[in-house]
């Protein structure tokens, strides 16, 4: 069987169309439309780009959007005050603090100040804890986007060996937990993992979440593996050597156009869920 490309751009557009239809229906009934508030602290050019993409995505589906721009010298206390105001605003359904913040900001304190009911980016400690216990919550956007890609293509991970390379709290760790919820047998690898190539060769499913260009080599990949590349590095390459590895995979995500578009689609989807006062459905 020829390898099948997991087209995140196509699925992302499908999700956005569904959101757009629901918002248009709300407008015809004179109901309040969902609104996402995004906080940008400082002048990081990459963050500026990401925030612009999110605002454009909101407008594209008819969703309300508010951007709060704070200066480079903003203190943690000033940021927390802004978050408190957004928490109290009944017209704001989701709050996103763009990462990274300037070094003087206690980013964990800021994330955890976001109301659990408005944590549509799945970044609070409470959301992470509920995810680990299998309790309904809002999920980190990139891992949940990967889950939706798997489901869209009917890829059953139950009983399969999955290897996640990278253990960041917003990607690697939650990805491992979601795959566990889907009954995969998961190995979570990191910088101290020994014999990494041998571990990856045993995997039916490989998730690249390490943030290093083409770190996972093609000759580490077993025939028929599912390749899920969540990395995006200079040169339009991910964390897996996809250009070579895809030839003996069963399914693979391209870079760009695979996992990336799903992240913003999930952010919009979870903002819509929040506006309806329910959480993201279980992944099983």
From Swiss-Prot:
Pfam families: THF_DHG_CYH, THF_DHG_CYH_C. SUPFAM superfamilies: Aminoacid dehydrogenase-like, N-terminal domain, NAD(P)-binding Rossmann-fold domains. InterPro entries: Aminoacid_DH-like_N_sf (IPR046346), NAD(P)-bd_dom_sf (IPR036291), THF_DH/CycHdrlase (IPR000672), THF_DH/CycHdrlase_cat_dom (IPR020630), THF_DH/CycHdrlase_CS (IPR020867), THF_DH/CycHdrlase_NAD-bd_dom (IPR020631). Keywords: Amino-acid biosynthesis, Histidine biosynthesis, Hydrolase, Methionine biosynthesis, Multifunctional enzyme, NADP, One-carbon metabolism, Oxidoreductase, Purine biosynthesis. Its EC number is 1.5.1.5, 3.5.4.9. It catalyses: (6R)-5,10-methylene-5,6,7,8-tetrahydrofolate + NADP(+) = (6R)-5,10-methenyltetrahydrofolate + NADPH; (6R)-5,10-methenyltetrahydrofolate + H2O = (6R)-10-formyltetrahydrofolate + H(+). Homodimer. Belongs to the tetrahydrofolate dehydrogenase/cyclohydrolase family. This is Bifunctional protein FolD. It comes from Leptospira borgpetersenii serovar Hardjo-bovis (strain JB197).
């Amino acid at each position: 069987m020829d390898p099948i490309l997991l087209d995140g751009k196509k699925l992302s557009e499908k999700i956005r169309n569904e959101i757009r239809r629901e918002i248009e229906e709300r407008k015809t009934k004179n109901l309040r439309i969902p609104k996402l508030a995004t906080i940008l602290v400082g002048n990081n050019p990459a963050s500026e780009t990401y925030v612009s993409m999110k605002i454009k995505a909101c407008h594209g589906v008819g969703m309300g959007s508010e951007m709060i721009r704070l200066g480079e010298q903003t203190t943690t206390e000033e940021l927390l005050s802004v978050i408190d105001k957004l928490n109290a605003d009944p017209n704001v359904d989701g709050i996103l603090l763009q990462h990274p913040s300037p070094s003087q900001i206690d980013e964990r304190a800021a994330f955890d100040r976001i109301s659990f009911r408005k944590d549509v980016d799945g970044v609070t400690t409470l959301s992470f804890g509920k995810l680990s216990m299998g309790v309904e919550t809002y999920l980190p956007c990139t891992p949940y986007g990967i889950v939706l890609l798997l489901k869209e293509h009917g890829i059953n991970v139950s009983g399969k060996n999955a290897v996640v390379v990278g253990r960041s709290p917003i990607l690697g760790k939650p990805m491992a937990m979601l795959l566990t919820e889907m009954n995969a047998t998961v190995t979570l690898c990191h910088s101290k993992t020994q014999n990494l190539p041998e571990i990856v060769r045993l995997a039916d499913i490989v998730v690249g979440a390490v943030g290093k260009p083409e770190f996972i080599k093609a000759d580490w990949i077993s025939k028929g593996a599912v390749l899920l590349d969540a990395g995006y590095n200079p040169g339009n390459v991910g964390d897996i050597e996809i250009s070579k590895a895809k030839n003996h995979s069963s399914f693979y995500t391209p870079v760009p156009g695979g996992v990336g578009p799903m992240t913003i689609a999930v952010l919009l989807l979870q903002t819509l869920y929040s506006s309806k006062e329910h959480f993201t459905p279980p992944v099983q």
